[in-house]
Structures are given as structure tokens and as C-alpha cells.
């Protein structure tokens, strides 16, 4: 693999605001600087609207089949070869829940050893730049805008009648940036599924992982765990080691069958108790469920290092996939890992404590409830008013998720569409055009009704306990207004877009 001396690395521009008007360039005394806001506006124009998404779900098989060939054509236009991608020493991770957290742990561990890391994830919470990180930080507005227009102009010129959709474009942009910066390892999180996901254009990753499987995106991936597992295992590549988190028998059988057909060495990650840690650890991402992701990260890191011949101090390179001695530096990296919006606590000076978690599947919501219950005790908030700020999106069913929150003693639910403000700014990072306003409003009403029906005495619930607003900022203001007379604890969950909006409004979205 390529290990670049620090002095030869390309320096990233410092983060700076590049606000401008309709023109995509802002003139400075030295040169024209591409406008970040204009790049975001054009990017948002690539989002699929609600009608298109419905069509995609109906025609999913035909459209999935052409997804990867299209990606290869775009990459060819950008002069990015399969060899260029292979040289990024990619760690490719799919799964339903925990894949982002596992990737974050991997990135933190490898970065702690001086490697230049590239991390591509989704979705973003506040700023779209969060999806493309180098050395643990989002790329600057300047770099994002410069590289955006490089990619956009080429693809617009050569594929004007067939522009890539939002996620696909960002994937191309991430590849472009990481190849240009010559990162030493790319941690690549799958978008949806795996088999037909545009990240699967990578031919030779160093190692693959499949985190916990659950029911999500069922209109695309299928209604059975075995069907979902088939898609997730689509990232397996011949002779490339792959790991999977413990799962059901039916899903495991599919993972094993796909591994055999692709000649893939496949291993189940061991429980965290199989490792010998140099000291007691508290992972930087809270929650007992994160230990499964820690185990996945440890296996991915060691397998990657073995494949690349990169020494990990205190960790013998080995093809053994059992637990191993975890040295102090690795414990530190696990604890220093940060992944906002997942099991996060935000306390304000306005008598409000927010528990935020982007859980949006049954298993993740159950884990969220267990984490929240533990934190309520730790924070000594058992006797304060508890509000649930909840919304779920796409084809997710509120009643299958919200029932897990019943033990928390919530006395009021607030729901809203995942738009930050009532009017949509198409140049804003938070703009979400994938669902119509009416659909989101209807889903918000379904959420509050599902909460009511989950209670033992739903007939006693008053209208004041069930509030629906037109946007996140209105819901946030309503919640904050109640803090004038009492202490409040708010659980924000169901959607990462919702969590990101609250972090933005609370001033924690930087």
C-alpha cells in the first residue's frame, strides 16, 4: 500500500464560508472561488421527488440492474479507473443498523496510527460535507465546492440527459476527492442494500463487513431478513475477507451461501467479551449495543492491516478471527470516537436535556429505548417531564417503532415533517425533497396516533399531549417554551434528518 510522508500530503483548505448570490463564483483578490451554496443548490436539484421515488419502487428491478453500469460510465468520464479505486485500500461496510458507527470506530482507530483516512457516510445531520471526511473532519466548503463543480461540469457535459441522482453524485464526488488527496484508506459505508448500491462499483476492497440486519427499506430490499441479507452480501468480493454480526439463522444461511458462491472467506464477529482490553473502556458512541459495532471494527481493522501489511502496535497480524488483546492506544481510539446523532446527549442552558438517536428500525429503536432508560437514571431525570419528538420517513411504520418507547414514561409526543423550516430553501444543506409536504404531514399525524394507541389507557390522552407542527423549528420552539416553568427531558428519534435539525437549532451542528 502507499504510505505517504506527511510533508508530501495535500493540505486541505481551512473551513470557511463561501456565501454568494446566484453566480456560482465569488470573486476574491486572488482568484474566483466556487460558491458552496450554489453547489448545494445544484446538488439538491438531483434529489428524487416523491413521485419519482414511487416510480423507482415499482420499477426497482429494472433500475437496479443499470445502476452500477451507469456508475462506471460516470467514473470513466471523470478519468477514475477501477485501479484508482482499488488503490484507496477500501473497507466496505453494509448492514441495516450500526454500519455508520462501526465505520466511525474503524476510522478513529486507523487515524490514530497516523494514516490519512477518507470516510464516506450517509446521511448527513446538518451539513452535506459531513458525508465526505478526511482525517476525521468534513472537507471544507471551498474544497467541496471546487470538486463539486469539477465533477458536475464534466458529467453535465457528457451525460446531460442522464444526470446521476443525489446519493450517486455524492459517491462520485467522494471518490474524486479521495483519489485526488491520495488517502491511505477509505472507509466506505453502503447507502441502501449493497448488491445494487452505487458504492458497490468498487471491485477489490481490502475487507468487507455486514453489521446487524433488521427490517428497513423493505419496498426496495424485500420483506424477509433472508432477502435483505442477500442484498447486504452483494458487496462480497472473491477472496476478500468478510465479517458479519450475529444474526438470525435464515439470514446467516443466505450470507454463507453468497460467500460460498463468491469464494469469500466469511467470519462471524465474536462477542466483545472475547477480547482482552488493556483497560476498561467506554466507547465514544454511547449505548451497550455499540459493543457489537466495536467488535466489528476491531475485526475489520486487523483484517485490513493484515491484507495491507500495515503494523498495528501490540496487535499481531493474523488471519485468526477470534478475540485478541486490544492495546491501550486502540482503547483510546475507541473512546475518542465521535459519531453525532447516535446516542447523543445535549444539555442546554434553558432547562432542557435532549437525548438524540437516529434509530429508525425495530432493533435500533429497542436499543435506543434501553439506552434512554439508562441515561434517564444516570442523569437523575426520572421525575422530570418527558417529551418524545418523533418522526419516521419513507415506508417505515410508526407503530412498529414507537411501541419500544413505552417503558420510558413519556407524557407528551411532538411530531413534524423533517424540514428545518416551513419554507424550503433549495440551497440549504437540510433541504429534503424526497417526500411531499402532505405525505410528511400525514406521517406526523400517524406518529402521534401510534404513540396514543401504544399506551395502556389511550382514551385518557388529551389533545395537549399530542402536538403536530409544520417543521422542526416550530416543534423545537414549542418544546423550548415549556422549559420556562419546568425542567424537561426530550427524546428525539425516528429519523436522522429530525435529529440533525434539532442539533442545528440547538447550536450543536458544527
Curated annotation (Swiss-Prot):
It is an enzyme of class 6 (ligase). A monovalent cation. Its cofactor is a monovalent cation. It is found in: Mitochondrion inner membrane; Mitochondrion matrix; Cytoplasm. Mg(2+) 1 binds at residues 122, 189. GO terms for cellular component: cytoplasm; cytosol; mitochondrial inner membrane; mitochondrial matrix; mitochondrion. The keyword Membrane applies. GO terms for molecular function: ATP binding; metal ion binding; tetrahydrofolylpolyglutamate synthase activity. It comes from the Eukaryota. Mg(2+) 2 binds at residue 217. GO terms for biological process: one-carbon metabolic process; tetrahydrofolylpolyglutamate biosynthetic process. Keywords: ATP-binding, Cytoplasm, Ligase, Magnesium, Membrane, Metal-binding, Mitochondrion, Mitochondrion inner membrane, Nucleotide-binding, One-carbon metabolism. Pathway: Cofactor biosynthesis; tetrahydrofolylpolyglutamate biosynthesis. Its EC number is 6.3.2.17. It catalyses: (6S)-5,6,7,8-tetrahydrofolyl-(gamma-L-Glu)(n) + L-glutamate + ATP = (6S)-5,6,7,8-tetrahydrofolyl-(gamma-L-Glu)(n+1) + ADP + phosphate + H(+). InterPro entries: Folylpolyglutamate_synth, Folylpolyglutamate_synth_CS, Folylpolyglutamate_synth_euk, Mur-like_cat_sf, Mur_ligase_C_dom_sf. ATP binds at residues 98-101, 342, 357. PANTHER family: FOLYLPOLYGLUTAMATE SYNTHASE, MITOCHONDRIAL, FOLYLPOLYGLUTAMATE SYNTHASE-RELATED. NCBIfam families: folC. Catalyzes conversion of folates to polyglutamate derivatives allowing concentration of folate compounds in the cell and the intracellular retention of these cofactors, which are important substrates for most of the folate-dependent enzymes that are involved in one-carbon transfer reactions involved in purine, pyrimidine and amino acid synthesis. Belongs to the folylpolyglutamate synthase family. This is Putative folylpolyglutamate synthase.
Amino acid at each position: 500500500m502507499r504510505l505517504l510522508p506527511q510533508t508530501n500530503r495535500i493540505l486541505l483548505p481551512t473551513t470557511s464560508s463561501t456565501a454568494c448570490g446566484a453566480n456560482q463564483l465569488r470573486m476574491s483578490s486572488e482568484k474566483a472561488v466556487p460558491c458552496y451554496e450554489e453547489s448545494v443548490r445544484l446538488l439538491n436539484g438531483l434529489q428524487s421527488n416523491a413521485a419519482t421515488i414511487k416510480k423507482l419502487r415499482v420499477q426497482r428491478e429494472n433500475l437496479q440492474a443499470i445502476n452500477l453500469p451507469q456508475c462506471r460510465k460516470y467514473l470513466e468520464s471523470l478519468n477514475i479507473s477501477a485501479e484508482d479505486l482499488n488503490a484507496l485500500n477500501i473497507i466496505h461496510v453494509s448492514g441495516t443498523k450500526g454500519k455508520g458507527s462501526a465505520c466511525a470506530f474503524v476510522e478513529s482507530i486507523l487515524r490514530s496510527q497516523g494514516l490519512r483516512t477518507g470516510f464516506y457516510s450517509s446521511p448527513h445531520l446538518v451539513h452535506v460535507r459531513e458525508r465526505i471526511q478526511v482525517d476525521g473532519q468534513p472537507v471544507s466548503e471551498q474544497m467541496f465546492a471546487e470538486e463539486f463543480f469539477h465533477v458536475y461540469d464534466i458529467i453535465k457535459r457528457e451525460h446531460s440527459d442522464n444526470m446521476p441522482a443525489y446519493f450517486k453524485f455524492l459517491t462520485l464526488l467522494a471518490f474524486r476527492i479521495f483519489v485526488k488527496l491520495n488517502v491511505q484508506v477509505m472507509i466506505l459505508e453502503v447507502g441502501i442494500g449493497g448488491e445494487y448500491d452505487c458504492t458497490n462499483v468498487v471491485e477489490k476492497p481490502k475487507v468487507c463487513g455486514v453489521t446487524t440486519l433488521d427490517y428497513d427499506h423493505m419496498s426496495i430490499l424485500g420483506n424477509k431478513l433472508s432477502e435483505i441479507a442477500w442484498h447486504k452480501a452483494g458487496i462480497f468480493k472473491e477472496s476478500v475477507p468478510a465479517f458479519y454480526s450475529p444474526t438470525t439463522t435464515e439470514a446467516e444461511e443466505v450470507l454463507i451461501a453468497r460467500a460460498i458462491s463468491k469464494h469469500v472467506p466469511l467470519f462471524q464477529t465474536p462477542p466483545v467479551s472475547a477480547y482482552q482490553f488493556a483497560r476498561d473502556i467506554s466507547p465514544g458512541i454511547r449505548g451497550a449495543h455499540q459493543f457489537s459495532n466495536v467488535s466489528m471494527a476491531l475485526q475489520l481493522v486487523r483484517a485490513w492491516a493484515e491484507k495491507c501489511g500495515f503494523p498495528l502496535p501490540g496487535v499481531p497480524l493474523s488471519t485468526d478471527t477470534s478475540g485478541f488483546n486490544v492495546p491501550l492506544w486502540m482503547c483510546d481510539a475507541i473512546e475518542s470516537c465521535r459519531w453525532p446523532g447516535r446516542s447523543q446527549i445535549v444539555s442546554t442552558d434553558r432547562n432542557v436535556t435532549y437525548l438524540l438517536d437516529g434509530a429508525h428500525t425495530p432493533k435500533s429503536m429497542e436499543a435506543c429505548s434501553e439506552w434512554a432508560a439508562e441515561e434517564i437514571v444516570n442523569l437523575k431525570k426520572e421525575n422530570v417531564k418527558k417529551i418524545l419528538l418523533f418522526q419516521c420517513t419513507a415506508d417505515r411504520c410508526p407503530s412498529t417503532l414507537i411501541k419500544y418507547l413505552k417503558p420510558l414514561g413519556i407524557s407528551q409526543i411532538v411530531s413534524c415533517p423533517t424540514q428545518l423550516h416551513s419554507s424550503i430553501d433549495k440551497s440549504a444543506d437540510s433541504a429534503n425533497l424526497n417526500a411531499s409536504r402532505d405525505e410528511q404531514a400525514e406521517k406526523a399525524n400517524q406518529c402521534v396516533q401510534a404513540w396514543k394507541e401504544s399506551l395502556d389507557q389511550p382514551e385518557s390522552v388529551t389533545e395537549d399531549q399530542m402536538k403536530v407542527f409544520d417543521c422542526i423549528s416550530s416543534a423545537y420552539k414549542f418544546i423550548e417554551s415549556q422549559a420556562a416553568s419546568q425542567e424537561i427531558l426530550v427524546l428525539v428519534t425516528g429519523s436522522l434528518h429530525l435529529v440533525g435539525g434539532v442539533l442545528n437549532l440547538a447550536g450543536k451542528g458544527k
